[in-house]
């Protein structure tokens, strides 16, 4: 399974979604634009998407949920260790109030992994983010040893994806 992402204006991305209703397309609002995500076993219908292989998942994507996309940079010599660490995280995410879905994504190009956490709303996510589970497994401090010394990669950061009707 692959997850493809592309950013643009609400109108442009919504037209893509309307023209391809047979596809698994999900549109969200960010602080400064809109984003469309496509989950697919094959090629994307998006023209120039960022492409990721889904290497771990729980739950289903839903446009009515709040998502946090965490961008985790790494270097070639740390990729396997980062991936192994994240795949070995064995935590009961479903036990967190409001939890809906999780995706661990490996880039098809580049060296920045993504982690998507889906929750019923931002408050439920913030509660999870304050937990020991998050801080010990997904925080910048927990993952910084896998970033590598190279300055060629991006930095660890989060981007919030809001349901269109809520933002």
Curated annotation (Swiss-Prot):
Superkingdom assignment: Bacteria
InterPro entries given in the database record: ABM_dom, Dimeric_a/b-barrel, Heme-degrading_MO
GO CC entries: membrane
Modified residues (Phosphohistidine): 65, 78, 153
Domain ABM: 66-157
Gene3D superfamilies the record matches: 3.30.70.100
Keywords: Membrane, Phosphoprotein
Post-translational modification: RIP inhibits TRAP phosphorylation.
Compartmental location: Membrane
PANTHER family: SIGNAL TRANSDUCTION PROTEIN TRAP (PTHR34474:SF2)
More about this protein: Down-expressed in ATCC 12228 compared with ATCC 35984.
Similarity comment: family membership: Belongs to the TRAP family.
Protein name: Signal transduction protein TRAP
Naturally occurring in which organism (per UniProt): Staphylococcus epidermidis (strain ATCC 12228 / FDA PCI 1200)
Gene name per UniProt: traP
